[in-house]
Swiss-Prot record:
GO terms for cellular component: mitochondrial inner membrane; respiratory chain complex I. The chain crosses the membrane at residues 31-51. It is found in: Mitochondrion inner membrane. Keywords: Electron transport, Membrane, Mitochondrion, Mitochondrion inner membrane, Respiratory chain, Transmembrane, Transmembrane helix, Transport. Belongs to the complex I NDUFA13 subunit family. This is NADH dehydrogenase [ubiquinone] 1 alpha subcomplex subunit 13. The lineage of its organism: Eukaryota, Amoebozoa, Evosea, Eumycetozoa, Dictyostelia. Its main location: mitochondrion. PANTHER family: NADH DEHYDROGENASE [UBIQUINONE] 1 ALPHA SUBCOMPLEX SUBUNIT 13, NADH DEHYDROGENASE UBIQUINONE 1 ALPHA SUBCOMPLEX SUBUNIT 13. Complex I is composed of about 45 different subunits. It is a single-pass membrane protein. Accessory subunit of the mitochondrial membrane respiratory chain NADH dehydrogenase (Complex I), that is believed not to be involved in catalysis. Complex I functions in the transfer of electrons from NADH to the respiratory chain. The immediate electron acceptor for the enzyme is believed to be ubiquinone. The gene is ndufa13.
Length: 113
């Protein structure tokens, strides 16, 4: 059996001592209000620009869709009339059934133009 003794050594502070701790209250330098105002204003300006540019495109697409539907609606109405007249139907004076009304859609589309 090998017998050895480990010498116990206490840890000591470095020569000259530890550096002083800074424990005083410190705060970051305040941001001037003008910088905050400019930042918020620029973000709002960019957001407003994006919103209104998208609104212009969206309105153009809706206008094109309305024009397209107003051009094709007479054809759809004629097809609906042909299907109605070709089908055997009861006398309109003794029934409450009515054909689908595309006239209301046409009036609504033409009113919006």
């Amino acid at each position: 059996m090998v017998g050895y003794r480990q010498k116990w050594v206490q840890d000591l502070p470095p020569a000259g001592g530890f550096p002083k701790l800074k424990y005083a209250r410190t705060s970051t330098s305040p941001i001037p209000g003008a910088y905050i105002f400019a930042g918020v204003f620029s973000i709002m300006a960019v957001g407003t620009y994006i919103f209104f540019s998208d609104k212009v495109e969206r309105n153009a697409r809706e206008e094109e869709e309305k024009r397209r539907l107003s051009m094709i609606l007479p054809i759809l109405q004629a097809e609906n009339d042909i299907n109605f007249l070709a089908s055997p139907h009861q006398n309109v004076y003794f029934t409450r059934w009515m054909p689908p009304q595309t006239g209301k859609r046409a009036a609504a589309l033409l009113r919006d133009l």
